[in-house]
Amino acid sequence: LSNIHDLEKFCDEYEKVIKELYRVLKPNKYCAILIGDTRRNKMYQPLAFMVMQRFLQNGFFLKEDIIKHQHNCKATGFWVNKSKEANFLLIMHEHLFVFQKIV
């Protein structure tokens, strides 16, 4: 999945995983994913919410959205300079979505 650069195609492929998660997860149990957003052509792309929507469309309920702040990322130094040159903010968080299969 990480080699798919088209976001819609990524979500379509991820949805196959979501359907299998729903199939194998026992009723009233939980599933969690950690996912971040991205940028395409300097524009913010809310990938986490695109994937979250696919979970909801496939029968899961969102129990929690925990925001994880990212510290000491290896590539931060490189992107700090790029963000100043290109006038965009760094993405410094990820979402830990906790879903529940309610039957």
PLM feature spans:
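Class I S-adenosyl-L-methionine-dependent methyltransferase catalytic core
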Residues: 1-103
